[in-house]
């Protein structure tokens, strides 16, 4: 079983029609292999628009592939910046935004970064889709509170940082 299988099952999400099956590699190898697989898929599908989310290597690979092909790219979660060039995700964010035809920013701060990079004319403030997803699944998570592992005390407060 793959790590992603649990998300498909738990949240009732259909499995993707296309899975490139790239797996973990160095940033360069992973990005290159995704670009190769995406190029073939995009040419076959011939979409009107391509949507890329976030700041992962797959996001950057999608942006570069679209910039070399006749496909328009919209970046969801655009404009986020840490101003830390040591983070690989920071490069992915900046390059993806500059390759994109349309930018959907989650915050006012993200919009400001995009304006500073002369990308304001193609940027739109849309809110944070991760918060939307959390609100969507919150009720199903709350219903499953009785199924907590015995080691978790429901009367205690916990902090969880989740990066998907």
Label each PLM-derived region with a short phrase.
Residues 7, 19-118:
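Active-site and donor-binding regions of nucleotide-sugar-utilizing enzymes
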Residues 9-12, 67, 140-142:
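Short, solvent-exposed amphipathic alpha-helical segments in soluble enzyme
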Residues 1-16:
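N-terminal glycine-rich anion-binding loop in soluble enzyme alpha/beta folds
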